[in-house]
């Protein structure tokens, strides 16, 4: 049966990203948010929100939901109005469309006919429908009706790591497989007006943005037709952090997606991340966390700061995560793939010897509901100039 399996590890062969055109500038967002939600009378809460935005280290975000949508659906700005139908009517259309845009960019970079795509993985926490976003994305792209699809709903911010793990398993166990893995989230699912009794809501309104990312994963790249690996996916793992139940969560209610984010999340991640690293890198003989490159989901500034401090990391280890957070906010599952894309582009622009900032080995981390940690040990490839 070995002839049915690929030889060697799976690699990321192409990356594509996409965002809605509408841009929200963070320094203007408190005024915008309280104006469109008709909450300008809540002056003290607005000042609290302004401080949250100022501390977020986010410069701008992309957002599908604009004022025209809010005028057409005025109930969306109410704090607890029954608006799930209106939200889903938008998102079941827009999530596959934005995902398709990211896929098209990945396929273009890959340079191969889309008929070679054998599997499609799609994850989103923004919407749920049957047939799913995977089906609609495949139709929009014109993929083969026999493409093997996997749809994963409600993973949240660790989903970028999950799609890589599953894509790796598929590619390595099906010789010749080329897996298109897509993450897309649009935060119209959780946009709503402020409440004095719901400060967690304000954090979500301050940090989340819309985005989609797609990767093509395959083993045994065929260089004769121009396939080039960007990163090798060496090993994967997932764990639930101890004493973390209820710290990150999302609940679909009549008012939309209600998001939970506990203040202890940065501490929980920073206190447990080294154990994840030791388990991942002991077989390779690596114990210096400054000797690897980092592709880290930037759930928020505090998470990056706490991990950096706990592991005594150099300040440049999270430069790509901080850049993506600044330019796009937290886009849930796709964010870590934006970071991967930024790392390989910056490595090329700065003349580094590898796609991993000049380092051979690296790690990708996703953090999300559970509190779940998804990690991938990644190996860079040399850059040929």
From Swiss-Prot:
CDD domains: CHS_like
Protein name: 3,5,7-trioxododecanoyl-CoA synthase
Catalysed reaction equations from the record: hexanoyl-CoA + 3 malonyl-CoA + 3 H(+) = 3,5,7-trioxododecanoyl-CoA + 3 CO2 + 3 CoA; 3,5,7-trioxododecanoyl-CoA = olivetol + CO2 + CoA
One Pfam family, short name: Chal_sti_synt_C
EC number: 2.3.1.206, 4.4.1.-
Gene3D superfamilies according to UniProt: 3.40.47.10
Family membership: Belongs to the thiolase-like superfamily. Chalcone/stilbene synthases family.
InterPro entries named among the record's database cross-references: Chalcone/stilbene_synt_C (IPR012328), Chalcone/stilbene_synt_N (IPR001099), Chalcone/stilbene_synthase_AS (IPR018088), Polyketide_synthase_type-III (IPR011141), Thiolase-like (IPR016039)
Active site as annotated: 157
Tissue note: Expressed in bracts, flowers and young leaves. Not detected in mature leaves, roots and stems. Expressed in glandular trichomes.
Lineage: Eukaryota, Viridiplantae, Streptophyta, Embryophyta, Tracheophyta
Protein task: Involved in the biosynthesis of cannabinoids-related terpenophenolic natural products, which have pharmacological activity. Polyketide synthase responsible for olivetol biosynthesis, from a C(12)-polyketide, probably 3,5,7-trioxododecanoyl-CoA. Catalyzes the first step in the cannabinoids biosynthetic pathway. The preferred substrate is hexanoyl-CoA, but also accepts CoA esters with C4 to C8 aliphatic side chains.
Pathway(s) this gene product operates in, as recorded in its UniProt entry: Secondary metabolite biosynthesis; terpenoid biosynthesis
UniProt-recorded Gene Ontology molecular function terms: acyltransferase activity, transferring groups other than amino-acyl groups; lyase activity
One of the GO biological process terms: polyketide biosynthetic process
Keyword field: Acyltransferase, Lyase, Transferase
